[in-house]
């Protein structure tokens, strides 16, 4: 589980997702957590739900609260994709649910020699299985 710095809604805030939190997102949205990224269904409603779950260790805020704050931030000139969507995607990948290859693609600074060798071996095995 990776903590992703996210100070947009409060100083020193970070978000994270673990299996329990991903289950909460699935219950709230009716969609499998992995499908959110794979099917590119990260719309505004989904963003507010994910933010309410991924940041709840700081304060319990509703998706509606995040929608209102996002509106204010957009009016102030933030970029939704750069400032909100990309960190949320990193947070989802940081949970590990999308697999090691996606994780290391988004967090290349954490790639070690042993992890690189493991990913290479997994790719070779996947090709053999085709």
Feature names for model-found ranges:
Residues 1-7, 27-40, 45, 57-130:
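Charged interaction scaffolds used for protein-protein
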Residues 8-12:
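Glycine-centered positions within short beta-strands or beta-hairpins
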Residues 15, 23-29:
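Short amphipathic alpha-helical "interface-anchor" segments enriched in bulky aromatics
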Residues 18:
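Residue-level signal for threonine
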Residues 51:
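Active-site/pore-lining binding-face segments in mid-to-C-terminal subdomains
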Residues 54:
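Short, structured surface segments that line ligand/substrate-binding pockets
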């Amino acid at each position: 589980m990776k903590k992703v710095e996210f100070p947009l809604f409060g100083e020193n805030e970070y978000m994270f997702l673990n299996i329990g939190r991903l289950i909460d997102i699935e219950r709230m949205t009716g969609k499998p957590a992995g499908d959110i990224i794979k099917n590119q269904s990260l719309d505004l409603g989904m963003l507010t739900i994910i933010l309410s779950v991924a940041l709840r260790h700081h304060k319990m805020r509703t998706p509606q609260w995040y929608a209102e704050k996002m509106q204010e931030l957009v009016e102030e000139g933030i970029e939704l994709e750069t400032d909100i969507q990309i960190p949320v995607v990193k947070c989802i990948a940081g949970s590990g649910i999308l697999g090691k290859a996606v994780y290391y693609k988004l967090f290349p600074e954490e790639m070690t020699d042993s992890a690189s060798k493991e990913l290479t071996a997994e790719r070779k095995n996947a090709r053999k299985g085709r």
